[in-house]
Regions:
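Dinucleotide-binding Rossmann-like beta1-alpha1 core, especially the glycine-rich loop
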Residues: 50-127, 252-257, 261-265, 291-292, ...
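Glycine/proline-enriched, intrinsically flexible loops and inter-domain linkers
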Residues: 377-818
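Glycine-rich FAD pyrophosphate-binding loop
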Residues: 24-46
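N-terminal Rossmann-like FAD-binding beta1-loop-alpha1 element of flavoenzymes
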Residues: 5-32
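Flavin-dependent oxidoreductases
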Residues: 18, 54, 177-295, 303-311, ...
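Helical element adjacent to the flavin cofactor pocket in flavoenzyme catalytic cores
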Residues: 139-198
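Short beta-strand to alpha-helix junction loop
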Residues: 64-67, 91-101, 140-158, 169, ...
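C-terminal catalytic lobe of FAD-dependent flavoproteins
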Residues: 252, 275-279, 287-424
Length: 818
């Protein structure tokens, strides 16, 4: 065994092999892959996975990863045998609700470049004559199919690049990982130690056990899953090819099927979650079949077999041969766990990755390791998304189990998890409960979505043109309409406590921050700037505001959900041995947004301060007193109205709320929830990171070029932006209004021009002040001119839309600045 390596990869399943393969293709050498079992039938989930590959996913990144996986597997073979069979897939509908859901999923697939179509019951039977005639239809995706993951892993290991760069050590168990000063130093096995700066854990169901070696609680959980194969089926007796039938999903009954020569494989999620602890997994030496396979539990498969017989009549009462409970991983949010952990430099994970995405994950992990950038937007799966409460054992148990049980459910994009809840409460929470707030959870915070106490305003405003009736009416209330309109007419109180607040101070803080941001920070004390933080390629990594509190002291404000992601990025750029202090002070500060035309009247009354533009200009800050509470006020608004963000110590939060709320009614200012917050920001054209803003687009494409100052000293991404400007824009973020009054879509729908998908919806809502349905999406510049006509495909129907000049509301920003 080598005693030193550039990188040690733990686990020789499909993810580990794919990453090693792609690193070798990028020119890396001195790569070690350690596997506790044999090569390549390792005994992990790769070894028993049925191999079904469905590329449709609500997440663009997950869909792209599966598409990359299909490309990879399709170009691999082992001893003349393919590693992928592109037989297509059918997602079957047996209920009207599922049929409608499939229309939506077809749209999502088209958005992300898939060949997705709805086929009739007759066409379903042409693809698979074994199916029942009672089905209502199916979504057919041409390039889905069956992957042979073990075959693919071995094929990659046989490549010249891998043979020259990678050493595999089978039957070798990792016993410990050593760190020095928070950095990876070496890895210890039962056959010796290897010194290395980088450890990548691709250990799958053993991932949490590896994480414990560096004191990280990986938020994933393993579950047993029932899978069986039938005896030979008479109707398939002449099928000698490995697979010819499209793979099947019967999501109404939480089942899937695959043909394998003359038999059928059947998998069922239609049973209670059966969790398995990583520390309880058997060793290879004592496992009956494999460490990732447990004894079949027929009681959990009874309903599945009844449902299988109803869908495929020839399966009724058929005998089963191969029967297992295979073990594989689920996470708390359904996404894999990728990236370098902030807690330990050099410790990386690529865990909870299914066969469907493994090839693509290996590719982006290699790029991430080699270049510091995965090449696509990975924020949904980045390890930096996890908050401390996400790492709690009880939280992991509940959320991962829920994701197992709901894996094939119809999930509305606004649907909330029922548990665990009430993890983080703002100091205003009890007051919000008294106002009958409808709460949603975001990053652990309970946030008002709307307030039932505002229902009385439905009599004030005519909302008949705005009422929703379909899918878009779920998880929504017309109260959001009046909260929007009342904010525009008078004002609203917004709970901003979940915002992430980061304090940066110390010698060199200005120079440091100015280097990692695109805007110019060297402004007078008290100024507030909006800026992006960029990757070296010019993509938008973060967007946030920075307030200069003193010469070398700054307050960075970021969103709540991605705040730790932004904090990690900022900290990762800090020079070694720097005197700069970066502290997350989020829990110590509460915040209220007081926004709307009468916000100045309210705040001047309760503070006694002159808040006029001459005394308190837009994008500036001051300390003010509200009922003897010292507050930091920032004149900035995320809804496009005159207003201030008011920050005060959390301990004074309830007093702050009472002081503001008790006087607000006199001015017609009401508490407002997130639903109206969203429609207000979209109407104003404000971007949301993760929707409009991501590492895949630069600030000019995103429409935030005003936050870039190319004439300042060097900053991260500057050279890339100069090059982007030289080449010119190919795609831009466009504002599109729907021609039909009252029309609303929900997001991720394809944008169609002359029957061709040219983009997809990043955000959508109704603009109640401009009386238009609004969507945003990236489209090629040749279609992005004002007046350009497009269609939005929503549940199989085409909604006509027009590219419009933005912002739609208050284009001259007069309401913000006066």
């Amino acid at each position: 065994m080598k005693d030193k390596a550039r990188i040690v990869i733990i686990g020789a399943g499909i993810v580990g092999c794919s990453t090693a393969y792609h690193l070798a293709l990028l020119g890396w050498s001195d790569i070690v892959v350690i596997e506790q079992g044999p090569i390549f039938e390792t005994g992990g989930s790769t070894s028993h996975a049925p191999g079904l590959v469905f590329q449709t996913n609500p997440s663009k990144t997950m869909s792209l990863l599966s598409q990359e996986t299909v490309k990879l597997y399709s170009n691999l073979e082992l001893n003349g045998n393919p590693c992928f069979y592109p037989v297509g897939s059918m997602e079957i509908a047996t209920t009207p609700e599922r049929l409608e859901e499939l229309k939506r999923r077809i749209g999502v697939g088209i958005s992300y470049g898939l060949d997705s179509t709805m086929i009739s019951p007759k066409e379903c039977l042409e693809y698979n004559p074994l199916l029942s005639e009672k089905i209502l239809g199916a979504m057919f995706v041409k390039n889905d199919g069956i992957a042979k993951a073990v075959r693919a892993a071995e094929s990659m290991s046989n490549s010249k690049a891998v043979k020259n760069s990678v050493e595999f050590y089978p039957h070798t168990k990792v016993t410990n990982i050593h760190t020095v000063n928070g950095k990876i130093n070496s890895i210890e096995t039962d056959k010796g130690s290897i010194k290395t700066d980088i450890v990548l854990s691709t250990a799958g169901i053993w991932g949490p056990k590896i994480g414990q070696m560096v004191n990280i609680n990986i938020p994933q959980k393993a579950f047993e899953h029932c899978y069986a194969k039938t005896i030979p089926i008479k109707e398939l007796e002449n099928h000698t090819k490995e697979v010819t039938h499209p793979v099947l999903r019967h999501q109404d009954k939480a089942m899937y099927f695959r043909q394998e020569k003359d038999v059928y494989g059947i998998g069922s999620y239609n049973h209670a979650a059966l969790p398995v602890l990583a520390n309880d997994l058997l060793d290879h030496k004592v496992a009956d079949i494999s460490p990732s396979i447990k004894s079949f539990t027929p009681e959990h498969f009874e309903l599945g077999m009844i449902d299988a017989g109803n869908l495929i009549p020839t399966l009724k009462n058929i005998d089963l041969t191969y029967k297992i409970n295979g073990i594989f991983s689920f996470t708390i949010d359904g996404f894999p766990i990728l990236g370098e952990w902030p807690q330990v430099k050099g410790f990386w994970s690529a865990e909870a990755v299914w066969i469907t995405h493994a090839g693509g994950v290996g590719k982006i992990m290699a790029q991430w390791l080699a270049y510091g950038d995965p090449g696509i937007d990975t924020h949904e799966m980045d390890v930096s998304r996890f908050h401390p409460h996400n790492m709690d054992k009880n939280y992991i148990d509940i959320r991962a189990s829920q994701n197992y049980v709901e894996v094939y459910d119809i999930i509305h994009p606004l649907q909330q998890s029922e548990a665990p809840r009430n993890l983080k409460l703002s100091p205003f929470h009890k007051s919000q409960q008294k106002l009958k707030a409808n709460f949603v959870e975001s990053a652990g915070w309970e946030r008002p979505n709307w307030f039932e106490s505002n229902k009385k305003l439905l009599k004030k405003f005519n909302t008949s043109n705005f009422l929703r009736r379909g899918w878009e009416n779920k998880e929504w209330s017309p109260v959001a309409i009046v909260e929007h309109l009342q904010t525009r007419s008078n004002g609203g109180l917004f709970d901003l406590t979940p915002f992430t607040k980061i304090e940066v101070q110390g010698k060199g803080s200005l120079e440091f921050l100015n280097y990692i941001i695109s805007n110019e920070l060297d402004k007078p004390v008290g100024k507030v700037i909006y800026t992006s933080l960029l990757t070296q390629n010019g993509g938008v990594k973060c967007d946030l505001t920075i307030t200069r509190l003193a010469e070398e002291k700054f307050l960075v404000i970021s969103g709540g959900a991605m705040g730790l992601h932004d904090l990690h990025w900022i900290k990762s750029k800090l020079p070694t041995n720097s005197d700069i202090e970066i502290n997350n002070i989020s829990n110590s500060m509460s915040a209220i947004g007081v926004w709307g035309p009468k916000s100045i009247n309210l705040l001047q009354k309760i503070s006694g301060f002159d808040l006029s533009s001459s005394s308190f200009p837009y994008m500036s800050s001051k300390k003010i007193l509200i009922n003897k509470i010292e507050c930091l006020a920032l004149r900035i608004s995320y809804v496009g109205e005159l207003g201030w963000e008011i920050y005060a110590p959390t301990a004074k939060g309830q007093d702050l709320w009472d002081s503001i709320y008790n006087q607000s009614e006199k001015f017609g200012i009401i508490p407002v929830g997130l639903a109206a917050f969203e429609s207000l920001r979209i109407e104003k054209g404000y971007r949301l990171w993760g929707n409009e803003l991501s590492t895949e687009y630069n600030p000019y494409e995103s429409g935030i070029g005003f936050a870039v100052k190319l004439d300042k000293k060097d900053f991260i991404g500057k050279q890339a932006l100069i090059e982007h400007n030289r080449i010119g824009l190919k795609k831009v973020l466009a504002c599109i209004t729907l021609d039909k009054q009252g029309a609303v879509v929900m997001g991720k729908e394809p944008i169609i021009f002359e029957n061709k998908c040219i983009g997809f919806v990043t955000s959508s809502s109704y603009g109640y002040s401009v009386d238009k349905g609004i969507v945003y999406g990236y489209i090629p510049v040749e279609y992005a001119y004002e007046g350009s006509k497009v269609n939005i495909l929503y549940f199989g129907k085409h909604y006509k839309g027009t590219v419009s000049k933005e912002p739609l509301f208050d284009p001259k920003n007069l309401r913000l600045k006066t």
